[in-house]
């Protein structure tokens, strides 16, 4: 039973090593307490109200990996944890046992350089003389052109990285196109279908 609740406490306010992961089951009468047509946050509004009114909140403690991926840095860190084997993930990719995961339908140029840890998705292509790896993820259908270099990046489906491009520490959403010789650096997050020259 929850007796106290603080959403995202400062280090000096922490009183437990448990976290609210945002998975809830409510009785219908609890949902009726939520006002219509106005912002109302479970953690900041509903839970304090329930505790103040003496309504019991029950919990269950789950084991395993959990990460709050509310910003780009934490999203990238969680991807890195997956590549490092700190949390399980399902894949049909073949592993070399050293941290390189490649889906069977991916195509890798003979002179491409692939370094661990990384994941190369279904139907992805990495051209000759391209570098890919060092905590990078290429989702399905990604194309990386000749003489391009991709390190510490997450490339969502159908991203196109043209010849001679350089990417470092970025997240590229679906169908982004990076033109010849373009550069993208640390902490960049590029929206879906953007074109970078």
Predicted stretch roles:
Residues 94-197:
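Structural signal for interior beta-strand "rungs" in well-ordered beta-sheet cores
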Residues 1-90:
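Catalytic-core segments of class I nucleotidyltransferases/pyrophosphorylases
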């Amino acid at each position: 039973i929850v007796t106290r609740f603080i959403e995202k406490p400062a280090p000096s306010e922490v009183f437990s090593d448990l976290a609210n992961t945002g998975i809830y089951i409510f009785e219908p009468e609890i949902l009726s307490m939520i006002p219509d047509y106005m912002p109302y946050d479970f953690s900041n509004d509903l839970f304090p109200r329930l505790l103040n009114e003496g309504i019991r909140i029950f919990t269950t403690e789950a084991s395993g990996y959990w990460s709050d991926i509310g910003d780009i840095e934490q999203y990238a860190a969680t991807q890195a944890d997956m590549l490092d084997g700190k949390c399980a993930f399902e894949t049909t990719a073949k592993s070399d046992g050293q941290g390189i995961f490649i889906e069977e339908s991916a195509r890798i140029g003979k002179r491409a350089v692939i370094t661990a840890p990384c994941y190369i998705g279904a139907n992805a292509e990495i051209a000759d003389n391209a570098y890919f790896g060092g905590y990078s993820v290429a989702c399905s259908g990604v194309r990386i052109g000749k003489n391009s270099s991709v390190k510490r990046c997450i490339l969502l489906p159908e991203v196109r990285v043209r010849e001679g491009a350089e990417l470092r520490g970025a997240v590229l959403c679906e169908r982004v196109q990076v033109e010849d010789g373009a550069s993208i650096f640390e902490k960049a997050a590029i929206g879906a279908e953007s074109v970078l020259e």
